Design a protein with these regions (language model features):
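Acidic, Ala/Val/Gly-enriched low-complexity intrinsically disordered segments
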Residues: 3-7, 23
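A short, N-terminal "cap"/entry segment at the start of jelly-roll beta-barrel domains
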Residues: 11-58, 73, 139-142
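Conserved short histidine dyad/triad with adjacent acidic residue
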Residues: 62-77
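Histidine-centered metal-chelating micro-motifs
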Residues: 71-73, 92, 108, 112-117
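Glycine- and acidic-residue-biased ligand/ion/polar-headgroup-sensing regions
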Residues: 79-81, 85-91
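A cytosolic small-molecule/anion-sensing beta-strand core signal
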Residues: 87-88, 103-104, 122
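Short acidic-glycine-tyrosine-enriched beta hairpin
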Residues: 98-112
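Ligand-binding loop in jelly-roll beta-barrel domains
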Residues: 112-136
Length: 142
């Protein structure tokens, strides 16, 4: 038994007990085993780690793709803060009234409540991290 697990047996009501115990068992998932789905904004997503495939409660990580010439639908999330990390392609990111060019290596912060969309000039592939985890119910379209 790990040191963390043995210590938790002495404190059965520790506030982080379930979080720590779930972290003790390693979860490794390969993106190739995750089926793609389309989000409300029109992007194609493959969940890497989220509530649907792992013991995740506070965040999610997915790979998103947007074909060349396509713009996702303008939307916002009331609760989720998002990070995008551009892996491939190029495009334009719009948050509120600001638009910027994005290329591989760029990281983008999207605050809760911020209207946003992305346009792929060259097919985009990017990581999307959300906290709390992504939910269709927390996606509001224009």
């Amino acid at each position: 038994m790990s040191d963390r697990a043995s210590e938790l047996t002495r404190f059965p009501f520790h506030p982080l007990r379930n979080t720590i115990l779930s972290a003790i068992a390693m979860t490794v998932l390969n993106i190739d085993t995750q089926p793609p789905f389309t989000t409300k904004d029109g992007s194609t997503i493959r969940s890497i780690l989220d509530r649907t495939n792992a013991a995740v409660s506070h965040q999610s990580l997915a790979e998103a793709s947007v074909p060349a010439g396509v713009t996702t639908q303008r939307h916002y999330h009331r609760q989720s803060e998002e990070f995008y990390y551009i892996l491939e392609g190029s495009g334009r990111m719009n948050i509120g009234d600001e638009t910027r060019a994005v290329v591989p290596g760029d990281a983008i912060l999207i605050a809760p409540g911020a209207w946003h969309f992305i346009t792929a000039e060259v097919a985009l592939r990017f990581l999307c991290a959300c906290s709390p985890p992504y939910s269709h119910d927390d996606t509001f379209l224009e």
